[in-house]
């Protein structure tokens, strides 16, 4: 275990308590390993192309821009909570990212993590649509199934 190094960690957020609990674990691990931490929010929408929060405004249609603005408004408190939870003297570099896509949320998260060469993914057991009877939500289950790296599932 002494050889384990999580230099890049990603936590998937949707605003649910399990996802925010997962963020707390991700913060602790990122601080322990002095990792880069990305808090990712994926918005599933019926659009033709993928858009992310770093895209220039002129490339987005008005309706897409409105959806992105709403996603930013919705996720800002989550991202602020994560920033506030981090130790002030932490060496962790925090990134926040919003991606809108018509594709499956779990697929976007897995693809993004792989493209960014993430070493650890952290997810909550269930998201906002989570049924209490399910131990593991469909997004978390798919991430565990298809991830290229270890996945920590937080209950």
Describe the residue ranges of each PLM region.
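General small-molecule cofactor/ligand-binding pocket signal
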Residues: 40, 95-99, 152
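Short glycine/serine/threonine/alanine-rich loop segments
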Residues: 35-36, 92, 118, 149
């Amino acid at each position: 275990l002494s050889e384990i190094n999580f230099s890049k960690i990603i936590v998937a957020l949707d605003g649910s308590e399990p996802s925010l609990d997962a963020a707390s674990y991700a913060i602790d691990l990122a601080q322990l390993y002095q990792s880069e931490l990305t808090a990712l929010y994926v918005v599933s929408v019926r659009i033709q192309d993928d858009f992310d929060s770093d895209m220039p405004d002129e490339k987005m249609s008005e309706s897409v821009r409105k959806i992105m603005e709403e996603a930013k408004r919705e996720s800002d408190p989550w991202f602020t909570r994560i920033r506030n939870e981090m130790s002030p003297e932490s060496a962790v570099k925090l990134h926040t990212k919003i991606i809108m896509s018509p594709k499956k949320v779990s697929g976007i998260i897995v693809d993004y993590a792989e493209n960014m060469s993430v070493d650890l993914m952290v997810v909550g057991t269930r998201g906002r649509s989570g049924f209490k009877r399910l131990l593991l939500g469909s997004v978390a289950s798919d991430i565990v199934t298809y991830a290229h790296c270890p996945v920590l599932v937080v209950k």
